[in-house]
């Protein structure tokens, strides 16, 4: 009998680092299941989780300050390998009898560490070998404190001039700590270091693969749903599309999708969704044409937050009206993904609390009285995309740029009108089409056009044109928390601008947004 894909698992304890989710994604990429839990996870829960190894993540606090986070004692009682990263190394050192102090020289950014100890973790892994035969690694540092005394039976693993104990290890106990961040791409050998810990030291088997995830998710859905019927709000976005494909494969005609066409979608998006799911895959999809209802409700409103709420409430009204026409629906499917689950863990007094269910549809009427099916709730976004490909969805659909829930409603500044939406749809289509032609679409993380309710004078032929202004926006980012504006070639911008002004009569001027995040947000509203 094949092993359950969750059988070999890693526990990651979160001490508040901005990189913690990145650690989890790296572990999953290696092919091993892991879960992120708050540092104050109780001992019994840790024992029940039964990990094959534990990673103590970084954090912003100082170990030597009162009430700073500590690793649960149960971790050190499990008898499994432990890997402390940055703060994780410091709390491990302090809790096992070592000492941590503040450092006069803080290390932030690129650094080179010398590998001075022969350990299972770093044996044969290096970026440089100097004239004296000393191995070196190019790494990313982000710390102010440092370990000044190691626990008994530990040895120095790595060092820098300002941080003599930049890494420590005990091969006998299988405990390792590094002051740098192996999870970020700036640490060139980071992937190899994590693989060494997880596959070799923890002896995990790479069971977490797209094909096995698909098989497991299909089996789980069938076990949960049985012969009951399921309702899904299909938006055409990546998450809901993958849920639709997965559920259709699992339960076939027991699935009914409601696609709400709010009049704020991209050009031909409604037709594309229906063609993909209803025509090609045979999924039962109800298309609710609610453009007038959305636009009427939005009339006269220019406040961005109020527009979002109106769009959200109207979606619920339309979705509810459609669901009431259906019989014997017992389950509501949602595209909740793992970051949603993590983020819905509250934070009081700087301490994370128990993870609770996250409802990404947000506010669907409780009187619907439906049970939830969330087949993606264990997956990160990149895993959802790989699962989509595994299920047969087209690459271009799975790797589309993100599109906001309120759609063009937040890309039209001020009041939303049908005229504005129609102009914006066409301009956006031209921009994306030219990005694809120039092989830039997948080089940027997100690209779109923003409609500005400002008119500008233009000249077309011998005539004067007084028409609207639009802005092009393209950004590059890894995590969407920070982003830089994309340095698109001038020739490409010229082509896009020329096409928009020449082909769309209502637009006379095109600008390019050169704001990064922060201080600007990616979307304008």
Swiss-Prot record:
The keyword Ligase appears for this protein: yes
SUPFAM superfamilies, alphabetized: Adenine nucleotide alpha hydrolases-like, Class I glutamine amidotransferase-like, GMP synthetase C-terminal dimerisation domain
Recorded catalytic activity of this chain's protein: XMP + L-glutamine + ATP + H2O = GMP + L-glutamate + AMP + diphosphate + 2 H(+)
Record bears the keyword Nucleotide-binding: yes
CDD domains in alphabetical order: GATase1_GMP_Synthase, GMP_synthase_C
Binding positions (ATP): 235-241
Protein purpose: Catalyzes the synthesis of GMP from XMP.
Name this polypeptide is given: GMP synthase [glutamine-hydrolyzing]
Lineage: Bacteria, Pseudomonadati, Pseudomonadota, Gammaproteobacteria, Pseudomonadales
């Amino acid at each position: 009998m094949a092993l359950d894909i969750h059988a070999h698992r890693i526990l990651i304890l979160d001490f508040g680092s901005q990189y913690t989710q990145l650690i989890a994604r790296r572990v999953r990429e290696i092919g091993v299941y892991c879960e992120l839990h708050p540092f104050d996870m109780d001992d019994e829960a840790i024992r029940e989780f039964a990990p094959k190894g534990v990673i103590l993540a970084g954090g912003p606090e100082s170990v030597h300050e009162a009430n700073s986070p500590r690793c649960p004692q149960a971790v050190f009682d499990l008898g499994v390998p432990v890997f402390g990263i940055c703060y994780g190394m410091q709390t491990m050192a302090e809790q096992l009898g070592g000492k941590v102090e503040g450092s006069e020289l803080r290390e932030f950014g690129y650094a080179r560490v010398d590998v001075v100890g022969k350990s299972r973790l770093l044996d044969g892994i290096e970026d440089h070998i100097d004239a004296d035969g000393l191995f070196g690694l190019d790494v990313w540092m982000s710390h102010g404190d440092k370990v000044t005394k190691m626990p008994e039976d530990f040895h120095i693993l790595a060092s820098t001039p300002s941080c003599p104990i930049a890494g420590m290890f005990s091969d006998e106990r299988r405990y390792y700590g590094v002051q740098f961040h192996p999870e970020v791409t700036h640490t060139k050998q980071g992937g190899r270091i994590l693989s060494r810990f997880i596959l070799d030291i923890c002896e995990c088997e790479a069971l977490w693969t797209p094909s096995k995830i698909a098989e497991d998710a299909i089996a789980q859905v069938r076990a949960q749903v049985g012969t009951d019927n399921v309702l899904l709000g299909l938006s055409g976005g990546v998450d809901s599309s993958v849920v639709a494909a997965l559920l259709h494969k699992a339960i076939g005609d027991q699935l009914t999708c409601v696609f709400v066409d709010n009049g704020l979608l991209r050009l031909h998006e409604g037709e594309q969704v229906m063609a993909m799911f209803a025509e090609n895959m045979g999924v039962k999809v109800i298309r609710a044409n609610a453009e007038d209802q959305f636009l009427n409700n939005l009339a006269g409103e220019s406040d961005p937050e109020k527009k979002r709420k109106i769009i959200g409430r109207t979606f619920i009204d339309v979705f509810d009206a459609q669901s009431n026409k259906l019989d014997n629906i017992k389950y509501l499917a949602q595209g909740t993904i793992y970051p949603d689950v993590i983020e819905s863990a509250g934070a009081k007094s700087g301490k994370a609390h128990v993870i609770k269910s996250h409802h990404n549809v947000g506010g669907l009427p409780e009187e619907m009285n439906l049970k939830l099916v969330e087949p993606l709730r264990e997956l990160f976004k990149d895993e959802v995309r790989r699962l989509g490909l595994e299920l047969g969805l087209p690459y271009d659909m799975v790797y589309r740029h993100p599109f906001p829930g309120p759609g063009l409603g937040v890309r039209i500044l001020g009041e939303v009108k049908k005229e504005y939406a129609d102009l914006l749809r066409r301009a956006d289509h031209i921009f994306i089409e030219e990005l694809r032609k120039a092989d830039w679409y997948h080089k940027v993380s997100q690209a779109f056009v923003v409609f500005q309710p400002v008119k500008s004078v233009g000249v077309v032929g011998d005539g004067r044109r007084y028409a609207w202004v639009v802005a092009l926006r393209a950004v590059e980012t890894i995590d969407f928390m920070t982003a830089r504006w994309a340095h698109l070639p001038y020739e490409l911008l010229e082509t896009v601008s020329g096409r928009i002004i020449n082909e769309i009569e209502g637009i006379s001027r095109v600008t390019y947004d050169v704001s990064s995040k922060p201080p600007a947000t990616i979307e304008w509203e």
